[in-house]
């Protein structure tokens, strides 16, 4: 839907309606990031997904609230949450699946020093207990400072991070 030009909120609403109409109890979680690669301005759409974090040095800001995932109902309480973002130089946006415990992830992010996106993702995934049978994924978004310069043309990117959750719950 996004590649066809639909707005992110409209695409999420359509996805929700499809899941509800199927009526098989399946659902997924959604993290969708739209960001201008030159300015860092953008939005993060969250729906049923684990919290995300904005990290700069030892400062960590939790992003997102608990919301039911798409497919479990309709109405205002069953909508994607849109969070406006302005990614700055040196900031890292951390997206995770629910297989990574929130408390352990947040503690690690506050304690670790400056790391490359690859090192940070590996550390976040290591926060999860190996005994829990769940997916453990971390995506780190960090804009390259060299590309963050004012231009007359705008380059936008969309990152989709979806996780298919349980069916028949």
Regions picked out by a protein language model, each given a short descriptive name:
Residues 25-30, 62-105, 129-133:
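Acidic loop->beta-strand submotif enriched in PP2C/PPM serine/threonine phosphatases
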Residues 1-57, 64, 80:
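Catalytic core of PPM/PP2C metal-dependent serine/threonine phosphatase domains
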Residues 15, 135-136:
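Catalytic palm active-site di-aspartate
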């Amino acid at each position: 839907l996004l590649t066809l030009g639909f707005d992110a909120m409209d695409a999420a609403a359509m996805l929700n309606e499809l899941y509800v109409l199927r009526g098989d109890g399946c659902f997924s979680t959604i993290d969708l990031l739209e960001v201008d690669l030159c300015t860092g301005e953008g939005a993060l759409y969250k729906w049923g997904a684990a919290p995300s974090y904005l990290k700069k040095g030892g400062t960590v800001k939790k992003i997102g609230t608990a919301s039911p995932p798409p497919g479990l109902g309709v109405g205002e309480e069953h909508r994607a949450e849109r969070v406006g973002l302005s990614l700055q130089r040196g900031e890292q946006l951390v997206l995770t699946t629910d297989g990574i415990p929130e408390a352990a992830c947040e503690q690690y992010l506050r304690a670790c020093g400056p790391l490359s996106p690859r090192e940070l993702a590996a550390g976040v995934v290591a926060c999860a207990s190996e005994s829990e049978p769940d997916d453990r994924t971390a995506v780190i978004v960090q804009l390259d400072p060299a590309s963050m310069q004012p231009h007359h043309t705008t380059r936008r990117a969309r990152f989709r991070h979806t996780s298919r959750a349980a069916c028949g719950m």
